[in-house]
Amino acid sequence: MTEFAHPGLYVHVPFCKTKCPYCDFTSVTSLSSIPDWLEAIKKEMLFYRDRFSRFDSLYLGGGTPSLLPDRDLADLHHHLRSHFLFAGDTEFTVEVNPDDISSSKPAALRDLGVNRISLGVQSFDDQELRFLKRRHTVDQAVKALDGFKDAGFAKVGLDLMYGLPGQTESSWLKTLEQATSFNPEHISCYQLTVEEHTPFGVLRAQGEMKPLDEETGSAFFVLTSVFLEEKGYLHYEISNFARGEENLCRHNLKYWKRAPYLGLGPSAHSYQGGSRWWNLRDLETYCRALAEGKPPVAGLETLTPEQVYLETILLGFRTRDGVDREIFRNRPGTEEILRHLQQARLVHHVGGRVVPTVKGFLVADSLPLLFAN
């Protein structure tokens, strides 16, 4: 997979019309705060314009970046370009919701320089969309998808969700069938995760909602991988599939490859030179700090060599590129662990790399514990 000459830039746009009942990301439903957020983002840029020289990926995530009025998107983009340098082939991604897409929005994003779209479809089943409290319908999702294709976007990705209570393999396959019928360049498939402090979390605590059990969730995962690979998609990261190497998400690969990246906005994370820092989560507190001329950083950590080692394993085993076998050299007991993982068909060896199987993807988050001192 790709190695990176430049860091990536992420901007968190924390605005939503309504809060989805499963979402634990930082977001607010008051759009009246957009001007304050935009001014704060401009101020935050000043802290980093000499620290990061050039980017080759720009990702607007949320929240719902497509909610921003065109003039505010243009203003944000102008200031980013004024303060930072970008490579000529920069990947510029914007997350969008189908119900926010007017007939003019695709062309406006294209003219701004956006060259990659991540469309939050979640399902091609209207009943499932209602359960998820999504504001769009299947017809709106199809219309948005057609709009971006008609506007000339060569890279459109779909976000889908499985593991909903009552969902069957056949209903999930129907969503996958419909998704692939549009030939999107990228598909992300996430299992519904019920977080404690969300409305779904409250329902689970009250016994009114039962998430998928682990065995069924694993079956859905394998089904997804097999289906999409048969359709010609590379299963290049646990939740992500691309139609060829050229359609991998460059920006997100930076996270998994431990490349440097800068995050602007409330709750955004950054990483550079072995240090990681993260911003204040609350929008009002974030804006106030910047209005007072202070960096909005909530915390910072410098990784120890052992943390770097374990994080490299954790992130590497999330991707089909795996982990360079060299990092295990002179680590007592690792050869035996690797042999056990191979016998269990969780990993295999490709050249000088240890690569997870689909079965290995299922337990990737727990594998670093085996290598901890």
Regions found by a protein language model. Give the residues of each.
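Short amphipathic alpha-helical interaction segments
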Residues: 329-343
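Conserved N-terminal Rossmann-fold NAD(P)-binding element of oxidoreductases
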Residues: 11
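C-terminal scaffold of the Radical SAM
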Residues: 4-8, 27-48, 54-329
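Local cysteine-cluster metal-coordination motifs and their immediate loop/turn environment
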Residues: 14-25
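A short, conserved structural fragment
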Residues: 342-352
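Short, amphipathic alpha-helical interaction segments positioned at domain boundaries
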Residues: 359-373
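Short, well-structured beta-strand/strand-turn elements
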Residues: 234-240, 336, 345-347
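Minor-groove-contacting beta-hairpin "wing" of winged helix-turn-helix DNA-binding domains
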Residues: 353-357
